[in-house]
Amino acid sequence: MLDLSQYPSLGAALRDALEQWSEETCLIEADRDRENSRHTYRQFNAAALPLARSLQEMGFAEEHRTAILMTNQSKWLISAYAIFYCGGVLVPLDYKLSAAEQLALLTHSKARFLIIEYFLWRALRSAPGFADCKPEAVLVTEAPAGADLGGACRWEECKGQGDPAFVPRSRKDWASIVYSSGTGGRPKGCVLTHENYLEQCRSLISLYPFAPGVRYLSILPTNHAIDFMVGFLGPFLCGATVVHLRTLRPEFIRDAFPRYRITYMSVVPMVLKNLEKGLRDRFGSLSPHRRFLLRCLIGLNRVLTRHRPNLKLSRLLLKDIHQAFGGELCCLFVGGAFAEPATLQFFYDLGIAVANGYGLTEAGTAVTLNDLKPFRPDTVGKPLPGVELRILNPDADGVGEVVVRSKTVMSHYLDDPELTDDTIVDGWLLTGDLGRLEASGHLQLAGRKKNMIVTEGGKNIYPEDLEAAFEGIPAKEFCIFAANYLWPQRALRGEQLVLVFHTEPGQKVSAAVPEELAARNRRLPDFKRISGYLLWEEDFPRTASMKIKRNILAEQIRKKLDRSTAVHQL
């Protein structure tokens, strides 16, 4: 086990890990029912160092920013390590964003190098504005033979001659720029340091140790803060094995558990719900006799493990279920969005512990995590080691804004000192989430103070980022809010977006307006669609630079309108 407190950078820690566990398997890449590749730590190192040398031959230098745009695959992790080895700054981008959104973030991050999958590169080159932000060097993976790469290099051919120069970095140096939100509005690039990552990793593995022989199933995109930490850094720094699955099809996820004897996996609530549905469907297809027996065994397991998990007992009582998950599954981690307590309880009753947590990119991923001592599905656990957590201005029920102080909290927002000063005050990160801290140390979330929603898939949606999609509607002016921001409620489920439609006093809205809004909605992914609109007859309050004062407008709406009667559903 490496002593991460003694390391100055991720590059240095990963370099030693690759040497210490050289013959252990570090990475398996699987796609549906076939295995694409398998790397030991030695082979992974042998693949990354020629790439690092090639980058340096192209002019890559210390602190150069490099964006990665790829689906889950081994080349993502190999590229990330090469960047850290060369002393660079990683910019992980979401491959599911539109090409226009990706270009906006590439421009904002000032990335000088880009490593990208071929189908994404083809779309990016066709997007308006591409010529204005093309990086100095582009490496394209998985390009077909003879494909026009537009001056880019083939990743597979980037094998420099000789050994690359290892570039040391310090704990306070930038390690990555991670975008915590969208794209159409004000980009929020979280600058995370090497210390942020090293301390976060130390905290997590103190509760759930990775080690050689542990097998972690990675299904979330590696650009996702959760998977980057527990699907790459955590396992690699401890000699464990990561299984990258390049599909989200439920049947292939289920098959991967027994095939690779998975120990841990991280999921977002949406994936957990899909797994629950699959299991309930299977249980429903059993004969009445077997269904009754199963209910009895589940009930017995629930009683015997009501205080804390007992894997040996659960695997004995519910052997068939645990064998379906490979027989070695210890825990599922769930985060990124609100998880229904009933779903967590469902898995716990089967003897499959689900450790839910709470975090945000600005805090280096995780802030709290359930240690399952005892199992508390109604909370998001206790603060991780090294994390201070307080409730700011609590009300009579003890509910207030959750604020965090830790070595894992980001350095700042990229090129946005105003937003940084509003978000980090006297060393405390203002999360914008409401919660209550119990005497036991468990955190209960109770809603949001900020104008945003989090989808079941773990995506942060900031309403102002969506307004461009509704430009041109027949309104004097409009803006979009999270309904729970306009009318705060003690809930994190059923979050919705509402469009505020500014009309002239007494003006009636024609039937064409909701039709137009519905048409615009259909062009958006489901998780970005507005659920309704409301009419507002007063001018929007604005700053001297004509920006909408959203907090003041929200307060005005809150005082004058009732949600149940004001919102017209689409």
Role assignments for model-derived ranges:
Residues 22-25, 160-179, 186, 209-215:
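Conserved pre-ATP/AMP-binding loop-to-beta segment of ANL
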Residues 198-215, 222-315:
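Conserved AMP-binding/adenylation subdomain of ANL enzymes
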Residues 58, 85-157, 495, 505, ...:
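Structural core segment of the AMP-binding/adenylate-forming
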Residues 265, 309, 313-443, 449-452, ...:
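Conserved AMP-binding/adenylate-forming
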Residues 97, 114, 406, 411-412, ...:
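AMP-binding/adenylate-forming catalytic core of the ANL superfamily
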